[in-house]
C-alpha cells in the first residue's frame, strides 16, 4: 500500500506519518519546508520521542518526501492508495488544487483503483471541507469520476505534539505524548476498509468528534487562558494550580453532560475520560506553552469551536455552564504580542466593549443572559 501525507511538521511526522509507516505502508511526505524535505530524502528516517511514564525513542524508516507545490506530488496522487493531511485547517484550501490536478492525471491514466483521502486536522468534518475545495478546482467533466473512485473520509484526531527543541538540532526529531487517537468514518471509504493499527473505524464519527472537541480541546484552551491570566508558563503548571484545575474539570463536566445527553455516552466512562485528559495535561515530559495553546482566540471563541459550541449545548438542554462561562471570560482576556488574533480581539473589545465584541465573535445574542454572565465574569477577572 502506498500513501502520500501532506504536512511533514511535528504532527505529520509524530502522529499520522508514524502510524502509516509503522503499518508497513510505503509513505511519502509532501511539504514546502525544503530543510525538512532534504533531511527526509537524505536519511529516509527520523526519530520520535514518545514521552510518558516510560519514555521510548522510536525510529520511523523507509520514508520519502516531495515538494507539495511541484509536479512530483501530482504524479504521486495518480498512483497512491491513500492521501492524508496534517497541514492545519487554513492550509487545506491551498493544497486542494494539487490534489485536483493529481486526480485528473489519475483519471487520464486509467487508474480506477479506489483512492481514499483523510484530512487529519483539528476541526469538525475537515475532509468534507477539503472535498469542497477539491471539487471547486475540478472541471465539471471530472467530478463524476472523482465521486465514483475517490473516498473523502472524515476523521477525529487526538495527540498532543508540542514544538520541542531538539538537543541535537535535528530538524526531523519530534516529541509526542504516549496517548493517541485516530477515529475515521468507515461509511465514507471507497473499496476495502484499511487495516492500520492505531486507526479506529466508526459509523458514528460526530459523537467522537464532539467528545474530543468538548473535552480535550475545551479543557486545553481553558487551562491555557486561565494559566496565562495567573502567570503560568506551561499547561502542566496551570493544571497543577488547584483553582484553575477546579474550573477546567468543571467545564469538562459541563460539556460532558451535553455529550451524555446528545449521544448517550456512559457517565462513568466519560468521567474516566476526563480524568485521563487531566493526567495528559499534567505530563511532566511535555513542555506545552500556554501561549501556544491559547493562540487564535477569535477562532476558539467562534460558534462551532471548543468554547461556544459546548455552551450552546448547555443552553439547548437547560444544563449548568458556570465554568464554561469562566473559560470564555478568560479567553477574552488573552493577550499575546506573537498572535495577530489576540491583538485583534483586544482592539475589538476596546472599540465595542466586551458585550458587543463577544456577540460579534461568537454569534451569541448580545442581549442574552449568557452573554451577560460572560461579561460579568470578564469584568470580575480584570
Swiss-Prot record:
Signal peptide as annotated in the record: none
InterPro entries per UniProt: 6-PGluconate_DH-like_C_sf, 6PGD_dom2, Mannitol_1_phos_5_DH, Mannitol_DH, Mannitol_DH_C, Mannitol_DH_CS, Mannitol_DH_N, NAD(P)-bd_dom_sf
Enzyme class label: oxidoreductase
Molecular function GO labels: mannitol-1-phosphate 5-dehydrogenase activity
Chain ranges passing through the membrane: none
A GO CC annotation given for this chain: cytosol
Catalytic reactions of this protein: D-mannitol 1-phosphate + NAD(+) = beta-D-fructose 6-phosphate + NADH + H(+)
Key words of the record: NAD, Oxidoreductase
Gene Ontology annotations of biological process type: mannitol catabolic process
Residues holding NAD(+): 3-14
Enzyme Commission number(s): 1.1.1.17
Domain of life of the source: Bacteria
HAMAP family reported for this sequence: Mannitol_dehydrog
Family assignment from sequence similarity: Belongs to the mannitol dehydrogenase family.
Protein name: Mannitol-1-phosphate 5-dehydrogenase
Native species: Salmonella agona (strain SL483)
Native organism taxonomy: Bacteria, Pseudomonadati, Pseudomonadota, Gammaproteobacteria, Enterobacterales
Amino acid at each position: 500500500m502506498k500513501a502520500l501525507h501532506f504536512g511533514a511538521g511535528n504532527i505529520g511526522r509524530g502522529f499520522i506519518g508514524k502510524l502509516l509507516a509503522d503499518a508497513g505502508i510505503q509513505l511519502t511526505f509532501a511539504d514546502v519546508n525544503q530543510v525538512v524535505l532534504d533531511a527526509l530524502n537524505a536519511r529516509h528516517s527520523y526519530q520520535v520521542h514518545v514521552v510518558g511514564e516510560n519514555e521510548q525513542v522510536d525510529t520511523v524508516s523507509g520514508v520519502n518526501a516531495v515538494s507539495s507545490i511541484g509536479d512530483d506530488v501530482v504524479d504521486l496522487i495518480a498512483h497512491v492508495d491513500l492521501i492524508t493531511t496534517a497541514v492545519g485547517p487554513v492550509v487545506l484550501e491551498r493544497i486542494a488544487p494539487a490534489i485536483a490536478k493529481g486526480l485528473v492525471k489519475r483519471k487520464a491514466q486509467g487508474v480506477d483503483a479506489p483512492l481514499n483521502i483523510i484530512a487529519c486536522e483539528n476541526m469538525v468534518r475537515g475532509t468534507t471541507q477539503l472535498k469542497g475545495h477539491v471539487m471547486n478546482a475540478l472541471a465539471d467533466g471530472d467530478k463524476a469520476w472523482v465521486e465514483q473512485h475517490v473516498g473523502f473520509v472524515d476523521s477525529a484526531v487526538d495527540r498532543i505534539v508540542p514544538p520541542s527543541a531538539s538537543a541535537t538540532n535535528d530538524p526531523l526529531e519530534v516529541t509526542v505524548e504516549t496517548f493517541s487517537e485516530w477515529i475515521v468514518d468507515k461509511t465514507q471509504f471507497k473499496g476495502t476498509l484499511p487495516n492500520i493499527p492505531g486507526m479506529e473505524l466508526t459509523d458514528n464519527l460526530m459523537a467522537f468528534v464532539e467528545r474530543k472537541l468538548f473535552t480535550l480541546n475545551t479543557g486545553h484552551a481553558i487551562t491555557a487562558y486561565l494559566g496565562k491570566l495567573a502567570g503560568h508558563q506551561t499547561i502542566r503548571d496551570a493544571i497543577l494550580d488547584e483553582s484553575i484545575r477546579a474550573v477546567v474539570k468543571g467545564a469538562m463536566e459541563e460539556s460532558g453532560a451535553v455529550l451524555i445527553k446528545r449521544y448517550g455516552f456512559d457517565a462513568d466512562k466519560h468521567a474516566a475520560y476526563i480524568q485521563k485528559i487531566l493526567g495528559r495535561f499534567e505530563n511532566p515530559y511535555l513542555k506545552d506553552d500556554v501561549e501556544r495553546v491559547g493562540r487564535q482566540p477569535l477562532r476558539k471563541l467562534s460558534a462551532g469551536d471548543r468554547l461556544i459550541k459546548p455552551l450552546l449545548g448547555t443552553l439547548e438542554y437547560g444544563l449548568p455552564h458556570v465554568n464554561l462561562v469562566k473559560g470564555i471570560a478568560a479567553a477574552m482576556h488573552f493577550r499575546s504580542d506573537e498572535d495577530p488574533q489576540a491583538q485583534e480581539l483586544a482592539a475589538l473589545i476596546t472599540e465595542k466593549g466586551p458585550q458587543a465584541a463577544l456577540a460579534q465573535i461568537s454569534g451569541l445574542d448580545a442581549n442574552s443572559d449568557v452573554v451577560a454572565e460572560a461579561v460579568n465574569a470578564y469584568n470580575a477577572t480584570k
